[in-house]
Amino acid sequence: AITLARWICRSYKVHTGRELLQVDSQAAGDAVLKQLWHHTDSIMCCSVKMNDSAVFSFANQAGLDMLETTLLALQDIMLDKILDEAGRKVLLSEFSKIMQQGFAYLPAGLCVSSMGRPVSYEQAVAWKVLNDDNSNHCLAFMFINWSFV
């Protein structure tokens, strides 16, 4: 988890030019993971697949709260099941940009928790998470200023 947290933060900075956290992404120990875990915006990762449904592999506490799930049950949730029709269309239209440029800003929208409750967000950011070999590891999403509606 510590390695994934470091990859998430480093990849965000590489692609957007901005820091995701207040702590250096190369910081020792679990400082990066702790800040990522307690980040106020929902941050989650899923597999990089367009032909299959992308399955979630990680979420911070805000992400688990937004999805109304646990880390254990997270792997049973698919990206296309939480996005509404408009969100799926936007993601599909931006997917090649995410893969080529490394990230994309997505407009405000709605999604749904695993319990079926509607969730609104002001903006979302999607970016490629690269491992230490600069290979694609997963896709990360940050849902900014989300709330149940």
Label each residue range with its predicted role.
Residues 34-149:
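Sensory/regulatory domains in signal-transduction proteins
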